[in-house]
Amino acid sequence: MLAALGDAKLWSSLSNVGIKAIHIGPTKQAGGWRGDELTPSVDGHFDRIGVGTDPAFGTQEEFVNLGRMAAAFNAVVLDDVIPGHTGKGPDFRLAERAYEDYPGLYHMVEIAIEDWGLLPEVEEGKDAANLGGPAVDALCAKGYIVGHLQRVIFFEPGVKETDWSATPPVLGVDGVERRWVYLHYFKKGQPSLNWLDPSFAAQQMIVGDALHSIDVLGARGLRLDANGFLGVEGLGSGKAWSEGHPLSVVGNQLLAGVIRKAGAFSFQELNLAVDDIATMSKGGADLSYGAPRPNRGGI
C-alpha cells in the first residue's frame, strides 16, 4: 500500500486536483503478543504495540519515500498517535509479569489473592474476562478501582458490559502469581495508559511515538486519537469522572506542544460533549473535526 501511495504518477494526478495532504491512518505494528506469536489488531490498528511499520502495509522506507514524494508536489503526509491506550504487546505482557515499573505504564491494579473470588473466571485460551457490574462495584468498594465510567464505549452484552477486565493468574518475574484488573475505554485488547503514574512512562512512550512519526517517518501532521480519555478520577459516589477531565486537557496540550515544537501540527476527532470539545481545543490540537465512522463513533 505505502509503495503504491508513493508513486509519482499518482501524486501528479493528486496535485492536479489540488490535493495538499494525505492521511493514511495508522500503519505501525498493532495487535498483541501471546507466547511467541503476534496476534491481529482488534481495532483497525488503533491498538499499537510498536513503532515499526506493519509489513501488511509496506516498509518504513516506503513510508519515508511517500513523504518525500508528497513534499515534491507541495503536499504533506499525516500520521496518527494514540495517547490513551496500546494493544497487548510486549509492554503489557511485561506489566502483567510485574517487571520493574511496567505496571505503572497502564491503569491496572493487582488484586490480593483473598479477593480473587470477586473476579470472573477466564476461559481457557483467553487472556482476560470482562467484569460484570457487581464485580466493579465490589472492587470499587474495596478501593481497588474508581468504579464505573461515565459510559461504556463499544458496549456489547456478554462481551463488554463494563470498562474493566481481569487477567487470569499470571506468573511474575519474581515467581509470584498475580491477577490484575485493568481499564480499557475501548476493547479489552486495548489497555488504557496511566497518565498519572510517577514514572511518567506513558508520556515518554507517546511523545517518543509522535516524534518518531515526525523525525523518522517524515509526517508533517498527526491525528490525536481518543485524546479526550486520558484522565479518570473517582468521585466518592456515583460514576467516575472519565470525560472532560483536566488531565485530558493538560495531556493534550503537552502532546500538541511537543508536536508543534518539532515543526508539525496536530488535529483531533473528539467524541465528546460540545463543551468538552471547546475546552480540549484550548492550547491543544491545532485543528478539530467530527466525522462519524462505523464502530468508532464521532460527532
Q: Where in this protein do the model-derived segments appear?
A:
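Active-site groove signature of glycoside hydrolases
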Residues: 82-85, 210-233
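Internal alpha/beta core interface subdomains
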Residues: 196-199, 203, 210
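Acidic/aromatic-lined carbohydrate-recognition and catalytic surfaces
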Residues: 1-199, 230-288, 293-295
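Active-site-proximal substrate-binding groove within the catalytic cores of carbohydrate-active enzymes
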Residues: 299
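Outer-membrane beta-barrel transmembrane strands
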Residues: 58, 206-208
